[in-house]
A protein has these predicted regions:
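DEDD superfamily 3′-5′ metal-dependent exonuclease/proofreading module
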Residues: 1-28, 33-40, 50-362
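Short beta-strand scaffold segments in enzyme catalytic cores
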Residues: 45-47
């Protein structure tokens, strides 16, 4: 079995403490001769860790198929110092493969006692927003402009490894170790894509607000910078991200909308006036001019300038923004589009923006 260690310094653009205790995080990646542990072999495991000042990359590679168990045992022992595994698609492939492989040797893997962070799962909700062609590791690396020396895919290296087991070529060994090393070394810089996900909880500051006849344009300062400028839409709003600056354009609706009372059984509908009143007041109205309200007729009208709520927001009669309870209005009872009254105060605008940003990670 080949054991190789490399210590190096490199910046990490994303705060590691957001994943866990930095010194207890273990990035890992495996290389195999196929997708099924029962029909293929594990030949390489790489692990990357950070001690607070520098990175350490460790790799264990089987020089022959019979050394698979040695590789497994070495990695299992190494995991003892860590409590969180960080990987790309490891929940679906790497971890199940290692467990199945270990079972063939009656080995117990420590994964059930460790936290697991699958970066693919974290990034998947961002695919459309970032206009990613697919969610392959190299596609995300290209989006972030992360360079590679390695030009092979894992599948292409299967035949390289099989040739290596027969010839023990240094050149082939280098190709195999390089691919795994770059998969791992590129994970810390790849973490920066999580800043887009973190926008859903990001503290932001409204810098300016410009109202036109039918739009509201808001400029904001973010608590962090995103790695790449991008434009996207969320519901009816347009977003432009540039470093730590966010510009958003919302449509404005001016006119009359209905507010539907949630406890409609407490109301009577007045057909001539086209609105509902509470039963305590309705008792003084001629019974010929009132009807028991239904969910569709228990409403009152409000006129003003309104902002849309994010699409898919559950239909409610009220919501709370910046500590204030605000009525939710619609054109019709069955309308999917919901609105709230526009307020120019900064606290309202910042809370309103968060409503939209929270939909990014869904």
């Amino acid at each position: 079995m080949i054991y190789q260690k490399e210590v190096f310094t490199a910046p990490c653009p994303y705060p590691l403490h957001r994943l866990g205790t930095p010194e207890r995080l273990l990035f890992f990646d495996i290389e195999t001769t196929g997708l099924s542990a029962g029909k293929s072999s594990l030949y390489l495991i790489g692990a990357l860790s950070f001690d607070g000042s520098q990175w350490k990359l460790v790799q264990w590679m089987a020089q022959r198929f019979l050394e698979e168990e040695q590789v497994l045992r070495a990695f299992t022992a190494y995991c003892a110092e860590y409590d969180t595994l960080v990987h790309f698609n490891g929940d679906t492939f790497d971890i199940p493969f290692l467990k199945a492989c270990a079972g063939q040797y009656n080995l117990s893997m420590p994964f059930d006692q460790m936290n697991s962070i699958d970066l693919l799962k974290q990034i998947r909700p961002l695919k459309s927003l970032l206009s990613l062609e697919n969610l392959k590791l190299k596609t995300i690396e290209r989006f972030l402009k992360i360079d590679r020396e390695d030009q092979y895919t894992g599948g292409e290296l299967i035949s390289v490894y099989k040739t290596y087991t027969n010839h023990q070529s240094e050149e082939l060994k280098h190709l195999l170790l390089l691919h795994n090393a770059e998969d791992l070394k590129n994970l810390p810089p790849l973490l920066s894509v999580l800043f887009y996900k973190d926008l859903s909880e990001c503290k932001l500051t409204v810098l300016s607000c410009v109202q036109t006849e039918d739009t509201l344009q808001i400029a904001c300062q973010l608590a962090f910078a995103v790695p790449k400028d991008t434009c996207f839409s969320l519901s009816s709003a347009s977003f432009h991200l540039e470093a730590d600056h966010l510009d958003v354009t919302f449509p404005l609706y001016t006119g009359k909308l209905r507010y539907f009372y949630p406890n409609y059984r407490e109301y009577y509908y007045l057909p001539l006036e086209d609105y509902a009143i509470h039963k305590k007041v309705a008792q003084f109205v001629d019974p010929a001019h009132r009807k028991k309200a239904t969910a569709k007729t228990a409403y009152t009208w409000q006129e003003g300038c309104y902002l849309p709520l994010p699409a898919g927001k559950k239909a409610v009669s009220e919501l709370t923004l910046s500590g204030e309870t605000i009525p939710v209005l619609r054109e019709e009872y069955s309308s999917r589009d919901c609105y709230i009254l526009f307020q120019p105060e900064r606290a309202f605008l910042e809370a309103y923006l968060q409503l939209f940003l929270q939909t990014m990670s869904r």
